[in-house]
Amino acid sequence: MADTGEPYAAARREVIKEHAAASSCGPPSGSKVLLWINGPCGAGKKTTASELHRRLPGSVVCAPGAVGLAMHRMLPPSARSSWQDIPAWRHSVLELLRLTLAGHDGPVIAPGTLVDDGHFQEIIGRLRDEGVEAHHVALPAEPATVVRRLRARSLGLEPRTQLWEVTLLDGWLEQLRRPEFATHIHTDHKTVAQVADVIAQAAGLTITPSIDGPVRAWLHRYATTIRHIRWA
């Protein structure tokens, strides 16, 4: 825990400065870049998005799940299911991404689950047709890995709000393995930093190197987990 403080901050500032000066740092000026990180709940979408955001200067995270959670809070438990099947969710996410891309010059990172090809085309396909440089990656993992992560997110409990996610897990993973949802990055045996590196390489973006030690990397993951605990 002695690596915190000014030496660490100074090192990160130097790394960011060097990469900002590099001519190969990201897409041409003026292009609109979207990174959609797909996968079932518990695959590591949000932690990966957070890692990319920290290491990709000028990026912003636009989380489609926040729209779905708001809709779920308006519905009785008996009516809750996968929000990607709700037309209002898909329309809202598309419009919010359009607004974010129009108002922000840097890459937009969107961690969200899409397992239906029609829904995929309705959001990502539409944005591509409109000229957005939309990159998509899927983060499949073994069911046992996903369930373990969901339990960790809920502090070891079996939260009622995630029961529907577990029941849909096998179907989601089967869908995401299809070639239509490439690029596939299996996360079972990769660190979050390694997954972020692969995504950046696939999208042709240069991110700052990870200089986190194991403790700091764990703290970042834990902080992201705490922020996304679902209490109701």
Regions found by a protein language model. Name each.
Residues 1-25:
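C-terminal alpha-helical interaction appendages
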